[in-house]
Amino acid sequence: MSKALYIDYQKCTGCRLCELVCSVSHDGISNPARSRIRVMKWEAEGLYVPMSCQQCQDAPCKLVCPVKAISRDEEMGRVFVDYDVCIGCRSCIGACPFGAMSFNLKEKKVFKCDLCDGTPQCVRFCEVKAVDFIDVDEVSVIKKRSAAKRLSVAGKEASGLEARLHR
């Protein structure tokens, strides 16, 4: 069964340790610009959202790659870049709807989350467990529960509004 990163942004404290661990584990340097996961900050709201490749089923990055350097590893459930084939054209960067691909100016190649070959270091080092690596089916169940909860709240609000309108 394939696994996926699951981000619970409500747990994220914005410490950015995931970014540092990622860059060190991939490139041997502590540089958030080289991280495959980025923490987006909305400080006024106190909201921090770790973002990384969503490993899309119909990955736009894969579809636009002119040399087929991006493919899907079905066993691991990830989309990955073959760096020996990548020509650094950056078409995939523009195609990614999540902004999850970056470009290494030195190597002239794109880079993205590769799930650390099955042991994501961001998960291992996230002390608040805002980032987890769980079965795809479990992610689906969590998303369904979340959507049902939002619909329930919206339904209750709509019922209350309707009751006030018909007084």
Predicted regions: what is each one?
Residues 2, 34-35, 40-67, 83-167:
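Flanking helices and flexible, charged tails adjoining ferredoxin-like Fe-S electron-transfer domains
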Residues 16-24, 28-30, 35-42:
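A positional/architectural concept
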Residues 69-71:
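Membrane-helix exit/interface motif
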